[in-house]
């Protein structure tokens, strides 16, 4: 049997970078999905729906190949904080998040080419921001780093280092819960296991407290 290829339905540079950590036969494709939130749609339902829609948006995929899609949202006071529309929006978002806890939710959807409906996982991580100054916010915005990110920040940004504490999956906060992804892929008989837990922790220099539980199938993260 030919080696399966993987199709990542994402424009995210961070997700593409993370998949570069492994020797997979990768294809990248954009998913043209309307990301608007439905009226009265709960944040968790929203992020689940978008991951599914993105995964199903790629068609004509070979039967043994895999489509992977994800969506990430930042939730503060039950409200979704999306990608900033401009610098002023980014500033206000970071002010609202400052010195407060919030939730980052990433949903990942996987389907094989011969499958209509994707398998779905969601990872929810509680994140606490530090008490950064207004001047630090403005300097960070000048770097343009926050402009394409949910919640207007990147947990891995070493200069701004916005996060003071979080519990769980760092990769999920970056946009792809890799252990949840691996757990889902292992359901398929033609998938060759990848040691994502070891690779992820090595790349991020982070000892994940939930990786063993996730791979074991526990409902954590």
Show where each model-derived region lies.
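N-terminal beta1-alpha1 ligand-phosphate binding loop
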Residues: 2-24
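Anionic-ligand binding patches
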Residues: 4, 42-221
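Cofactor-binding loop segments of dinucleotide-utilizing enzymes, especially the Rossmann-like FAD-
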Residues: 11, 31, 113
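Flexible, glycine-rich phosphate/dinucleotide-binding loops
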Residues: 15, 35-37, 117
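Short loop/helix-cap segments at secondary-structure boundaries that form the rim of catalytic
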Residues: 17-21, 38, 60-61
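A short beta-strand-loop structural module common to alpha/beta enzyme folds
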Residues: 26-36
């Amino acid at each position: 049997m030919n080696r399966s290829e993987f199709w990542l339905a994402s424009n995210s540079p961070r997700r593409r970078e993370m998949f570069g950590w492994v020797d997979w036969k990768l294809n990248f494709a954009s998913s043209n999905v309307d990301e608007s939130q439905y009226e009265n749609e709960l944040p968790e339902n929203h992020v689940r729906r978008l991951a599914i829609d993105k995964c199903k948006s790629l068609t004509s995929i070979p039967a043994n190949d895999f489509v992977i899609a994800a969506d990430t949202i930042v939730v503060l006071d039950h409200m979704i904080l999306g990608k900033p529309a401009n610098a002023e929006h980014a500033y206000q978002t970071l002010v609202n998040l400052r010195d407060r806890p919030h939730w980052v939710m990433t949903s990942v959807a996987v389907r094989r080419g011969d499958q209509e409906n994707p398998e779905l996982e969601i990872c929810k991580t509680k994140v606490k921001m530090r008490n950064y100054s207004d001047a630090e916010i403005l300097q960070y915005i000048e770097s343009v780093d926050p402009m394409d990110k949910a919640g207007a920040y990147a947990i891995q940004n070493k200069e701004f280092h916005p996060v003071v504490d979080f519990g769980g999956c760092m990769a999920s906060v970056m946009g792809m819960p890799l252990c949840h992804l691996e757990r889902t892929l292992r359901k398929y008989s033609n998938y060759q296991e990848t040691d994502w837990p070891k690779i992820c922790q090595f790349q991020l220099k982070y000892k994940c407290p939930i990786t063993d539980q996730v791979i074991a199938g526990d409902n954590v993260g």
